C-alpha cells in the first residue's frame, strides 16, 4: 500500500528530534522512550540488519546501548548513564579523543563566520589545510583533493591514477588479498571480500589481487601484466590491513613494493585512511620504512572525530593532470570550511601533544598485556598483534570473538570485530587514552577471558 507524504508528521518528528538535541540529560522515562524509538526507527527506516549486528556485541542479547553523548576524551555514555571506555574509536576516527576541545572550538569559531563555501570565491581554510598537509606528508606529496570519506579519497586516487597513466597505455590496478578500500564501485573493485563484492558484480575491469605481504607474488603479477600488455597503472595497498584483521606485512615489504613500482613504472597508492594521523606510532604508517607514495589517501581521524573529511594527496607530477580542468573530479562539500577547520585543529593537537609517540608507548603497553593474556588463554586466543594503537586479538574461532566483544561490553569496554576477518577483535582506542585506562582495559580483557573459559568448561 502506497503511503502518502505527510508534512505534518515530518514537522512533528523534526521538532521532537530538535528538542532531544537541546537536552543534556534524560530522565528515566525519556530514556526508555528514546530507546524504544531508536530501535523502532532503525527497524522500519534505517536497516533492521544493524539491530542484529549490535546484538552480537552487547550483553544479555539486548539490542544494545543507545549512544547518547561522549563522556570524557576517551569514553562514551549511553542513555542509561553507563560509561564505556572506547577501544573501538569509531573504526579509527577518534585519534584525538571525543569532542576534543581544540577541534570543537575551531569548528564553532568557523561556524560563527561561514559554515560552507560559496563554490565561487576562494575559501582560505582549504588552501591552508592543503599547505599544512604538503608540509606534513612524506616525500614530494604536494597537492590535495578534499572529500568527505575514506572511500571517496580512494575513488579520487583511482581516477587520478587513471588520468595520469591512460596516455601511457597503463590501465591495470593491483590490490591485495584481505584489503579493504571502501564500498563505492571503484573502491570496491580494490576491496577483497567476496561478501561485499558479489552482489555488485561485475565490478570495474582491470583489477587484480595478490597475497598481502608476499613481495614475490607482487613481482610476478607486475611482470605477467607487462608481458601480456596489461601494464599496471598503480598498486594500491594499506601499510597495515585494518579490516583484514590488523595484518602487518613482513619488515621491508613496503620498501620492496616501492622499488617494484619504480621498476615497472606503476604508481604507488597508499591507503592510510585507518593507519594515518598518528595511529601506528608515526604520523603515517609508511614512515616506519621511510616509503614515499605517489598518492596518499586519508580520512577518518583527519576530522578529529568532529567533522567528516577525506583527502587525496599526490605529487605535482601526478596531480598536474587536473590542472587544465580542475572540474574533472569535484564534490560539493569536499574541503568545506567546517571540515577544514576540524582537520587543521586535529593536526595541531597531534603535533602539539606528540600523540604519535604516545600511541607508540601506550600501544606497546596494551599489546604486551594482550600477548600475556594470549599465553594464559591459548585455548581461546590465537594471537595478539598490532602497531601503535592499532591492535587485534585473534581468537580460535568466530564465536569466541563475538563472545569476547559481549564480555568486554559487560566490563564497560567497547570493542568490535573487523569487517574482513570475523575471528579478530579490533582494539583501536583514542591516542589520548590514559595509562590508567590502558590498565583498566587489560584487566577487563582478563576478566572477560576468565568468564569465557568458565562458560566453555560448563558447556
UniProtKB/Swiss-Prot annotation:
Hydrolase listed as a keyword: no
One Pfam short name: Aminotran_3
Enzyme kind, highest EC tier: transferase
Keyword annotations from UniProtKB, A to Z: Aminotransferase, Pyridoxal phosphate, Transferase
GO terms for biological process, alphabetical: L-lysine catabolic process; putrescine catabolic process
UniProt cross-references to PROSITE patterns, sorted A to Z: AA_TRANSFER_CLASS_3 (PS00600)
Claim: Ribosomal protein is one of the keywords in the record: no
Annotated residues for binding of pyridoxal 5'-phosphate: 150-151, 274, 332
Catalytic activity: an alkane-alpha,omega-diamine + 2-oxoglutarate = an omega-aminoaldehyde + L-glutamate; putrescine + 2-oxoglutarate = 1-pyrroline + L-glutamate + H2O; cadaverine + 2-oxoglutarate = 5-aminopentanal + L-glutamate
E.C. no: 2.6.1.82, 2.6.1.29
Modified residues (N6-(pyridoxal phosphate)lysine): 300
Family: Belongs to the class-III pyridoxal-phosphate-dependent aminotransferase family. Putrescine aminotransferase subfamily.
Protein known as: Putrescine aminotransferase
Amino acid at each position: 500500500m502506497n503511503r502518502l507524504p505527510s508534512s505534518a508528521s515530518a514537522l512533528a518528528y523534526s521538532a521532537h528530534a530538535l528538542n532531544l538535541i537541546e537536552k543534556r540529560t534524560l530522565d528515566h522515562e525519556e530514556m526508555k522512550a528514546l530507546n524504544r524509538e531508536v530501535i523502532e526507527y532503525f527497524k522500519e527506516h534505517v536497516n533492521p540488519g544493524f539491530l542484529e549486528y549490535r546484538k552480537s556485541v552487547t550483553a544479555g542479547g539486548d539490542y544494545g546501548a543507545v549512544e547518547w553523548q561522549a563522556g570524557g576524551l576517551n569514553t562514551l555514555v549511553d542513555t542509561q548513564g553507563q560509561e564505556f571506555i572506547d577501544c573501538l574509536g569509531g573504526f579509527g576516527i577518534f585519534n584525538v579523543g571525543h569532542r576534543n576541545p581544540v577541534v570543537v572550538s575551531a569548528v564553532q569559531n568557523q561556524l560563527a563566520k561561514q559554515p560552507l563555501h560559496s563554490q565561487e570565491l576562494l575559501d582560505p581554510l582549504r588552501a591552508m589545510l592543503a599547505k599544512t598537509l604538503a608540509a606534513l606528508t612524506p616525500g614530494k606529496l604536494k597537492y590535495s583533493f578534499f572529500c568527505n570519506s575514506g572511500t571517496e579519497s580512494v575513488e579520487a586516487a583511482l581516477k587520478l591514477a587513471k588520468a595520469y597513466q591512460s596516455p601511457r597505455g597503463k590501465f591495470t590496478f593491483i590490490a591485495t588479498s584481505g584489503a579493504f578500500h571502501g564500498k563505492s564501485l571503484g573502491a570496491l573493485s580494490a576491496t577483497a571480500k567476496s561478501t561485499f563484492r558479489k552482489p555488485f558484480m561485475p565490478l570495474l575491469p582491470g583489477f587484480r589481487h595478490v597475497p598481502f605481504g608476499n613481495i614475490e607474488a607482487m613481482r610476478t603479477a607486475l611482470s605477467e601484466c607487462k608481458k601480456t600488455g596489461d601494464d599496471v597503472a598503480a598498486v594500491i595497498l594499506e601499510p597495515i590491513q585494518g579490516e583484514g584483521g590488523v595484518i602487518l606485512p613482513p619488515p621491508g615489504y613496503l620498501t620492496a613494493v616501492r622499488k617494484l613500482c619504480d621498476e615497472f613504472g606503476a604508481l604507488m597508492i597508499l591507503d592510510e585512511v585507518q593507519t594515518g594521523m598518528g595511529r601506528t606510532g608515526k604520523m603515517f604508517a609508511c614512515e616506519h620504512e621511510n616509503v614515499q607514495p605517489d598518492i596518499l589517501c586519508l580520512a577518518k581521524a583527519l576530522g578529529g572525530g568532529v567533522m567528516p573529511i577525506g583527502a587525496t594527496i599526490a605529487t605535482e607530477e601526478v596531480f598536474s593532470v587536473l590542472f587544465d580542468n580542475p572540474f574533472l573530479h569535484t564534490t560539493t562539500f569536499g574541503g568545506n570550511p567546517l571540515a577544514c577547520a576540524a582537520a587543521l585543529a586535529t593536526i595541531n593537537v597531534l603535533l602539539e601533544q606528540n600523540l604519535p609517540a604516545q600511541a607508540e608507548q601506550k600501544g606497546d603497553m596494551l599489546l604486551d598485556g594482550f600477548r600475556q593474556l594470549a599465553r594464559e588463554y591459548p585455548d581461546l586466543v590465537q594471537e595478539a598483534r598490532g602497531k601503535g594503537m592499532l591492535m587485534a586479538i585473534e581468537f580460535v574461532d568466530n564465536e569466541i570473538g563475538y563472545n569476547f566483544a559481549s564480555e568486554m561490553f559487560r566490563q564497560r569496554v567497547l570493542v568490535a570485530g573487523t569487517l574482513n576477518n570475523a575471528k579478530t577483535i579490533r582494539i583501536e582506542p583514542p591516542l589520548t587514552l590514559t595509562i590508567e585506562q590502558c590498565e583498566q582495559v587489560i584487566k577487563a580483557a582478563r576478566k572477560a577471558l576468565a568468564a569465557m573459559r568458565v562458560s566453555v568448561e560448563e558447556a
